[in-house]
Amino acid sequence: MKLAYFDCPAGISGDMCLGALVDAGVPADYLIAQLAKLPMHDEYRLHFERVVKNGVAATKARVPLGERAGHTHRHLPEIRALLETASLPPRAAEWSVRVFVALAHAEALVHNTTPERVHFHEVGATDALVDVVGTCLGLDYLNIEALHCSALPVGGGLVHAAHGVMPVPTPAVVRLWESRRVPVYSNRIHRELVTPTGAAIACALAASFGEMPSMAVLRVGLGAGDMDLPIPNILRLWLGEATEPLLAARARTVTDVHAHAHHDHSHEEVVACLETQTDDLNPQISGYLFERLLAAGAADVFTVPVGMKKSRPGTLMTVLCAPHLLSTCEEILLRETTTLGVRRHFQVRSVLERHHEPVETIFGTVRIKVGSRDQQVLNAQPEFEDCRRLSEQTGQPLKLVQQVALATWHQRRPTQSERQN
């Protein structure tokens, strides 16, 4: 299992990623040849050079632009079409689209519009395309199966952007961090350390943020940024082989699922799955066990009747929990049941953005749980406990309270044409 880790003490930007990849062994000629497949080769030049930052040598990617580049501002549909028709390696093309979709959603939230309507200056700019696509080409060339990223420095101060002077971190970067709950910190350097392009690359491609995963180090590439800072303005790209089987399994799952991810407020998350079956457990203990596991933080617990050896009827119990709770839940299963072993593996589940919308019905207030993706509502259901409480208070059938609550919610929602206006 080949892992990569972005170590970002001085932040992250697209050109730093490119430089680190070339420093780690990706041939510059390969990147230049692949990028030439994009119908924009007359808008830029790409070259790499060795520089020294605070006494540390690193590789700097430079993308000087031609005159035509200054007049080109692409929208998301144009970028998607450009990438999907360029005959790039499939993974690199798919990852590139994912990065731009992530950034489009962040910009849309900032400007109160839709991702397709975002007028990109930074994102549609030629150098951003070179940085993003080049980074994805490099990761694909190195056959990276899982990418991880360190916590990111927030920076500070002000920066001039297409919409005027902005505080650092810029609004789009903040939205990207929100989408992945990225751990951030202050290193007391008040400059723009994380660019929108760098944040989008990390948030769209990294399986996790935080400490470096356990790996046998193969190579470390150093990519330099533009500014001179109190510390070396360098991104370190660590390449290695995973050394823990459980970690490797988890990383592989994250990589596979991220290849089909939708990067909006919906997300995909790794869950630990524990399973055990018994044929001699007192049924009274099962209810108590459910309570113990849920109180410990398990996301779900369920049982299924199964046929076991010697034709005995038994029960298969499955526990879903966050990976960091695996040991806790496993300990409860081993202590409280009659099992002699517990199976465990990692799975990935897609999770819709979820929020509650209260509605006033003729019976009282009911919260509607709404699930959405890409700003489109996919599911809506009344909260059971609210409906049960109102049913008990009013004497009305529970199913009627549920039906009225959902109908009331649908009536108050705007139509598609009203939302577009």
Swiss-Prot record:
Lineage: superkingdom: Bacteria
Keyword presence, Metal-binding: no
Assigned keywords, A-Z: Nickel
A GO MF term: lyase activity
Keyword Transcription assigned: no
Pfam families recorded: Ni_insertion
HAMAP family listed in its UniProt record: LarC
Family: Belongs to the LarC family.
Protein name as it appears in the record: Putative nickel insertion protein
Organism per entry: Gloeobacter violaceus (strain ATCC 29082 / PCC 7421)
